[in-house]
């Protein structure tokens, strides 16, 4: 599982300034006074997804054209204007499912929706993801579904936890997701999107995904 940048030839969708978000009251630092009751912290987007249906998860994902930033394979930050495609690829190189979001959506927000979509189509034993998906919520939800999560640990200023030898060997197959993204861009038109709007861009990319699936199945049969 991985995401790839999709550059678009359209303007960034402006946010509605009419929506005024009320300021959150800040709690005073330190222990609360006796009798004071502090409100419970709001759940994170990932925690909120636990109690949602697949349709609710997908509805909350931003699908408008936006600006995105990520690190490339060399460790340098790159920025682009457009979208982000999140394909879920099997170990044989065939995409099981895909979700298109705005470029500003973090990869981890799409992990649980992809897990549920792919579970309806294939029986998987493992789910392999890079450090962008490192989250206790994602790990627990995958384990509840009866699969093994192999997610590269993000130390976040702590000690990095390495894979066990057998897990590291299995994790090597995640490179198939990167090859799938590269083939979509180099061979099946994902690098040259001429249409505008989420629906048309998704249609353009899905035609490439269908062609990639057919080509990959042919390679597996030969």
What are these regions (language model features)?
Residues 1-131, 136-144:
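Polybasic low-complexity intrinsically disordered regions
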Residues 3, 77, 97, 102, ...:
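Generic secondary-structure boundary/loop-capping signal
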Residues 12-24, 187-202, 206:
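Compositionally biased, low-complexity linear motifs
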Residues 30, 36, 126, 131-199:
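Helix-centered, glycine/charged polyanion-binding patches within enzymatic domains
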Residues 110, 176, 180, 203-206, ...:
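Catalytic-loop motifs flanking and including active-site residues across diverse enzymes
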Residues 121, 180-183, 187-191, 213, ...:
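Hydrophobic alpha-helical segments
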Residues 199-222:
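Charge-patterned, long linear interaction tracts outside catalytic cores
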